[in-house]
Amino acid sequence: MDGVEADRGGRVAVNEDLTVGDKDNVYIIGDMINLNKLPGLAQVAMQGGAHAAKLIAAKTDEESTADEKEPFDYFDKGTMAIINRFNAVAKIGKTELHGLIPWLMWLGVHGAYLSGIRNRAFAVAEWMINVFSSLSLIHI
């Protein structure tokens, strides 16, 4: 896009409301934003998308009293990462966990965000096969 500067990592500096420069109808979300050193994580993208959608809806609704320039306020829900089978790490607030419990938490959180019963069923089947064998459906 003309007139938009990106940093060395390709991220675009955005205004506090996720708009770009003086373009109040262009929003950038996710790992493409450079705002307050936010990490390139899915939860930043999801919250940013919801925020941008709310502001766009406010602009299109003539009766809306919402602030069309409301700043994006990111809430860190925590971070999880799988290390290997039955082993993961999680940091939620100031609490740090490792081992089986965060591994099960990771499965639950990621399963909950899958859309559709078919996708969830396939993911659970894949995880169960991986738990009980070295065979993976991805390789079949």
Question: What is the role of each PLM region?
Answer:
Residues M1-A50, K54-A58:
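FAD-site-proximal beta/loop scaffold in flavoenzymes
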Residues K54-I138:
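C-terminal, flexible cofactor-proximal segment of oxidoreductases
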